């Protein structure tokens, strides 16, 4: 029972923004964020290095850069958003929450625009292939 409680508390901390970002991705692509984007190329998932491998990976590179630009804000925070038809609307009045939401919104739109260009060979891509020098944000 104690283990279940620890897992529940841990998930509460993880759930906020990652869950909402996943909803945005699903809304724009029809795909599962976890299965399609959590370990893709050199930048989709935790960390990132090297040269983005394709347009989808470049979406993740830009997303990482965006998070870097919202200094002082915690990127895993929960924020207010809504979906209207195909649009994603960030509605939070808190400047940090709004900025993080905008980073996620732009990335989800980018994934949607490139949904047919992603290549399965970049799923679970080894970071050992990500050694080329990265472009600047």
From Swiss-Prot:
Function: Snake venom phospholipase A2 (PLA2) that inhibits blood coagulation and platelet aggregation induced by ADP and arachidonic acid. Inhibits tumor cell adhesion and migration in a dose-dependent manner. Abolishes the attachment of human brain microvascular endothelial cells (HBMEC) to fibrinogen (IC(50)=0.12 uM) and dramatically reduces its adhesion to fibronectin (IC(50)=0.12 uM), whereas no effect is observed on type I collagen, vitronectin or laminin 1. Also blocks the cell migration toward fibronectin and fibrinogen.
Disulphide-bridged cysteine pairs: 42-130, 44-60, 59-110, 65-137, 66-103, 73-96, 90-101
Source species: Cerastes cerastes (Horned desert viper)
CC cofactor note: Binds 1 Ca(2+) ion.
Active-site annotation: 63, 104
A GO cellular component entry from the record: extracellular region
Binding residues for Ca(2+): 43, 45, 47, 64
Protein name: Acidic phospholipase A2 CC-PLA2-1
Localization of this protein: Secreted
Enzyme's top EC category: hydrolase
Post-translational changes noted in the entry: Glycosylated (2.5%).
Signal peptide positions on this chain: 1-16
Similarity comment: family membership: Belongs to the phospholipase A2 family. Group II subfamily. D49 sub-subfamily.
Additional facts recorded: Negative results: does not show cytotoxic activity on human fibrosarcoma and melanoma cell lines.
InterPro entries: PLipase_A2, PLipase_A2_Asp_AS, PLipase_A2_dom, PLipase_A2_dom_sf, PLipase_A2_His_AS
Keyword check for Magnesium: no
Catalyzed reactions: a 1,2-diacyl-sn-glycero-3-phosphocholine + H2O = a 1-acyl-sn-glycero-3-phosphocholine + a fatty acid + H(+)
Enzyme Commission number: 3.1.1.4
Record keywords, A-Z: Angiogenesis, Blood coagulation cascade inhibiting toxin, Calcium, Disulfide bond, Glycoprotein, Hemostasis impairing toxin, Hydrolase, Lipid degradation, Lipid metabolism, Metal-binding, Platelet aggregation inhibiting toxin, Secreted, Signal, Toxin
Principal localisation: secreted
PROSITE patterns linked to this entry: PA2_ASP, PA2_HIS
């Amino acid at each position: 029972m104690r283990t279940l409680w620890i897992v529940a508390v841990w998930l509460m901390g993880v759930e906020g923004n990652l869950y909402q970002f996943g909803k945005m991705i699903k809304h724009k692509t029809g795909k599962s964020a976890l299965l399609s984007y959590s370990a893709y190329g050199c930048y989709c998932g935790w960390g990132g290095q090297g040269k983005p491998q394709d347009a989808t990976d470049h979406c993740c590179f830009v997303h990482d850069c965006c998070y870097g630009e919202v200094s002082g804000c915690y990127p895993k925070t929960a924020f207010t958003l809504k979906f209207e038809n195909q649009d994603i609307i960030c509605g939070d009045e808190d400047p940090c929450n709004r900025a993080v939401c905008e980073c996620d919104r732009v990335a989800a739109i980018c994934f949607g625009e490139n949904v047919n260009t992603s290549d399965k060979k970049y799923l679970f891509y080894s970071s050992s292939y990500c050694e080329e020098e990265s472009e600047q944000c």
